[in-house]
Amino acid sequence: MTVKTPVYLDYAATTPVDKRVAEKMIPYLTETFGNPASNSHAFGWEAEEAVEKARADIAALINADPKEIVFTSGATESDNLAIKGAANFYKTKGKHLITVKTEHKAVLDTMRELERQGFEVTYLGVQENGLIDLEELKAAIRDDTILISVMWANNEIGVVQDIPAIGEICRERKIVFHVDAAQACGKVPVDVEAAKIDLLSMSAHKVYGPKGIGALYVRRKPRVRLEAQMHGGGHERGFRSGTLPTHQIVGMGEAFRIAKEELEQDMAHYRKLRDIFLKGIEGIEEVYINGDLEHRAPNNLNVSFNFVEGESLIMAVKELAVSSGSACTSASLEPSYVLRALGRNDELAHSSLRITFGRMTTEEEVQFAAELIKSKIGKLRELSPLWEMFKDGIDLNSIEWAAH
């Protein structure tokens, strides 16, 4: 089996631009280069037409109205605009916000910033499977709660929360509901109407579109108000000023159009690859799947291999492009805060691999990856004194280690 290495299995970090998307973008760099806001000539009109077509394609994937789509530079900006924008607009009603400990840093750090500004934030824990307890969420709601932010699919463990149920709770209590859907679009069905979502963050580069472009869905009925975070020429109905990058927007629109058209086959492809991988690592002892396998984005696997050091594991499988933790925070040596929130100990949190499949991943590549990981785990454990002790039946938790 000849597989070209390194094999890219880090699609949750980013995806290559689909060739169909790249082709669609090129004319808007050199030919149809007008500013979409120039409304006095054909160059501007053509660019605006392309932007509106993309807006409609993006809206279609999430079952929204095109007028509800606001272009941003990516999901991080969308999260900032949604959370800061809503918190500041509705702060006269109350200053209490609710989110989850396993959210992306773009949400958590935005919440921290709002705490510095005098807001109060409740960070909900998760169960061992990564799902929040809806009763706990209900109990956390107060009369002064104005916003709840819960991600659709987790970037590290792929766990999919019960978004429609949370949407129901928020609508009933008239609380603004924000959802970070960067990892959900194109991987699971997303419907903002059915799920009663008020604000939804999206990114193009997680869906085979270009980097540097994203969008925020802002509900019109019932209308959700935001305070702008970027001031200027009043573009995007005043929500987000700045000249629209037509080529990027066209790319995102085409990527989302394809994602809607090919969602079923993409999902089936991911499930098949996931099953092949899980079958391939069967028989390795002390393997823990992190996060619920049922309620999960089909392209994500996060696996901890006990008695193996995470960093040495990444080095050992250098023919695979995989990650430990998310790409945004994998530079730090701290164990993943997401895995810690599941109750995993430091050792298991440190020995995790996030393997995420994509549209271009082949069955051969996944087979190769599973076999490689299996053989390397065996070799690394042979070198581990802890593994030897574990195999000898020694309870490692009962050992008193001498301090040096």
From Swiss-Prot:
Swiss-Prot/TrEMBL cofactor(s): pyridoxal 5'-phosphate
Protein function: Master enzyme that delivers sulfur to a number of partners involved in Fe-S cluster assembly, tRNA modification or cofactor biosynthesis. Catalyzes the removal of elemental sulfur atoms from cysteine to produce alanine. Functions as a sulfur delivery protein for Fe-S cluster synthesis onto IscU, an Fe-S scaffold assembly protein, as well as other S acceptor proteins.
Catalysis: reaction(s): (sulfur carrier)-H + L-cysteine = (sulfur carrier)-SH + L-alanine
PROSITE patterns: AA_TRANSFER_CLASS_5
Keywords: 2Fe-2S, Cytoplasm, Iron, Iron-sulfur, Metal-binding, Pyridoxal phosphate, Transferase
Protein encoded by which gene: iscS
Pfam families, sorted: Aminotran_5
N6-(pyridoxal phosphate)lysine: modified positions: K206
Any single Gene Ontology cellular-component annotation: L-cysteine desulfurase complex
Pathway stated in the Swiss-Prot or TrEMBL entry: Cofactor biosynthesis; iron-sulfur cluster biosynthesis
NCBIfam families cross-referenced by the UniProt entry: IscS, PRK14012.1
EC number(s) recorded for this UniProt protein: 2.8.1.7
Enzyme class: transferase
Positions bound to [2Fe-2S] cluster: C328
Keyword set includes Lipoprotein: no
UniProt family annotation: Belongs to the class-V pyridoxal-phosphate-dependent aminotransferase family. NifS/IscS subfamily.
Active site: C328
Species for this entry: Neisseria meningitidis serogroup C / serotype 2a (strain ATCC 700532 / DSM 15464 / FAM18)
UniProt-recorded name of the protein: Cysteine desulfurase IscS
Location, primary (coarse class): cytoplasm
InterPro entries: Aminotrans_V_dom, Aminotrans_V_PyrdxlP_BS, Cys_deSase_IscS, Cysteine_dSase, PyrdxlP-dep_Trfase, PyrdxlP-dep_Trfase_major, PyrdxlP-dep_Trfase_small
One biological process term in Gene Ontology: [2Fe-2S] cluster assembly
Compartments reported by the entry: Cytoplasm
